[in-house]
Every structure is written in structure tokens, then in C-alpha cells.
Amino acid sequence: MSLNDAYAHCDTLLKEQDYDRWLACLFLPASARKHAHALYAFSSEIARVRESVREALPGEIRLQYWRDVLNAESSDNPVAAALLETVKSFRLPLAPLQNLIDARVADLYDDGFANQNDLEGYCGETCSVLFQLVAIVAGGEANSLSKAAGHAGVAYAMAGLLSILPVHQARGQCYLPENHLKSHGLAREDIGKPESVKQLRAILLDMAQLARDHLQKAQSAVAALPPDVRPAFLPLALVHKKLESIIKNPDPARILSTVAGWRKILALWLASTRT
């Protein structure tokens, strides 16, 4: 498979598995787009490991495969081949990608988070890193991106986690910090019980407001970046309405409905005109 075919595969995979990010990539410079596809496709493959296995061990083996990929010179896997070429072309650091893989190990064991800092750290290692690397691909300087990428990743990841709470519950997962549950008199096993709805609504509201705070800080930091780099942060344009919907109605039994594609494109376009 040629590199062009590998990048085309990443394009197709991302469109199927992470449509929001795929749409956001349309607003990147053409020279950066395929590299963003490779980074996001890699992340998507790592995130899907938990869904594709029934036990932790096969998942560990799959994650180890991707660790080995990062240390390889080449690969027959199209996502891996495109990723390695992107890393090489932009001299991207491997440590953040390795940390992303390591952070996803917790998903295999359905580990929760003791506190808010742990949750924010997970969001940073699985999502902030993507904002950072895509921004570098778009021409940003690594040492100027930390604040924007850090807050952006936490806001984006938390909004995603909060919007599908029932899905996680069905899998036996919980991404709500244990100390927040305890402060409202709940334990992890209480999630889903009718008598816990009032407390869970309060927790969801708190977490959505926290994510909104990160979003506002991210937007301020992005505004200070060079205009050519700001499109790397366009996925944030899809976060605001999601968080406002949760804040307006923090229903723990609700999965946020999918927004029509044209509305997403409009939101991204409007955001792109302000960059």
C-alpha cells in the first residue's frame, strides 16, 4: 500500500468513526489535512480497543501492538504507516502518543477516577495531545500551544464523556470522579438507580460547568495564537452547544441527540470566519 493510499484510508476511517473531527479537518490547510487525519485515525483506533474486546488481556495486546508501531520504521497497517510518516515529516515527539496509549489502559479495566484532577489528566493525555500535535502540523510552535491545547482537550473530552453517560453505564464504566459522587452521597454502583437521579443531575451540572470553564479558557488562549494555527482548534466549535444542552437539562438517562451534519458544518464555518 502506498502512502497516498494509507492517508486515504485514514480519511475514510475518520469519516466513519469520528465525523465531527473529520468535518473540522475540512477547514485545515490542504497541506495539513492528511496529517491531521492520520493523528485522529490513530486516536480513534486506540479508543476503539475497549469496544472490540471482552476481556482486558486481548486489549492489552492490541495496545502493545501500537506501542511497538511507534518504535518501528514502517508498517503494513495503513493507519500506522500514515502516522509514522506524519511523525517523521514534522518531527513530532513520540512520548505524547505513547502516553495516549497508556492512558487508554484504564478503559480496559473500567477504572474510574478518584478525583477531578485524575479526570482532567486523562482528558489531557487522550485529547489535549491531539490538539497540540494537529496545531504543530498546522504550523504552530510547540512551546506556545500548551495552554490552548490543555484546556481545549479537557473541554472537548469532558463534553464527549458527559453526553453518553448511559452508554458508559451499560458497559460498566464510570468517568465521574469518585470524590464528586461521594460528596453527593453516591457510590459508583448507584449510577442508574432511580433514587440517584437528583444527585446525578447535580453532578452532571457541576461537570458540564467545569468543562465550560475549560472551553472559555481554551478560546481565550486560541485567540492569542497566530491565525494560521487556530483552525487546529475548530473542533471546539462543536462543544459549546453540547455543554449548554447538558447544563440546561442534566439528565443522566439521556444520550445527547446527534446534531444534523449541516448544523455542524455551519458552526465550524462560522468559527472559521472568526479565526
Where are these regions (language model features)?
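Catalytic cores of Mg2+-dependent Asp-rich isoprenoid enzymes
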Residues: 1-86, 93, 97-104, 123-132, ...
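Acidic/His metal-coordination segments adjacent to aromatic residues that form catalytic metal sites
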Residues: 105-118, 193, 197
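Alpha-helical transmembrane segments of multipass membrane proteins
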Residues: 133-137
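A broad structural signal for alpha-helix termini and local helix breaks/kinks
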Residues: 138-139, 163
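Helix-coil boundary and interhelical linker segments in multi-pass alpha-helical membrane proteins
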Residues: 140-144
